[in-house]
Amino acid sequence: MKRLCVFAGSSKGSKAAYAEAARALGAGAAQRGVGIVYGGAAQGLMGLCADAALAAGGEVIGVLPQALSDREIAHPRLTELRIVGTLHARKATMAALADAFVALPGGCGTLDELFEAITWRQLSLHAKPIGLFEVEGYFAPLLSFLRSAADEGFVPRATLAAIAVRSEVPALLDSLLHE
């Protein structure tokens, strides 16, 4: 795996564990020689993940829509910053640059990115591994919903089985590398 696409909150959330997880993921990926592709902002969990990867000597590519770039939220120290026209182009560019996807805790934008990656895999538009970095049960309600949707016949069981859910960086990265 050359690059990992990280979906993460643009805020830090309410628990220190979220920030710790973002830093651990960035540093852990860099220590394994895995670059990070992400939304390009300096703030929130996404910024913390990028900072940690950069501090560990890793490659970090940010992909930022022009509208957000105009608000001056771009991370100033990235290996590379790509400015794209739309949020749709951002997701497509991140997917094209990455070999796997991981979601950290986040809000609607993070879930939008995650669900698009899951949907593309379900439709066989890619076969890239997808992981959730489970931090203090953050994704438990989402996983419960997905199991319910599968029980009701709306989500294939194979889609659920394709999502690696781990609470430690080494186990998460190992699961993505060995899928």
Name each model-derived stretch.
Residues A89-S124, G131:
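Active-site/ligand-binding-proximal alpha/beta "capping" segment
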Residues L123-P141:
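Short, positively charged, low-complexity/disordered linker segments
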Residues L54, R121-K128, F154-V155:
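Arginine/glycine-rich "motif VI" loop of SF2 helicases in the C-terminal RecA-like domain
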Residues M1-L97, L114, V135-E179:
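A cross-family phosphate/adenosyl-ligand binding-site feature
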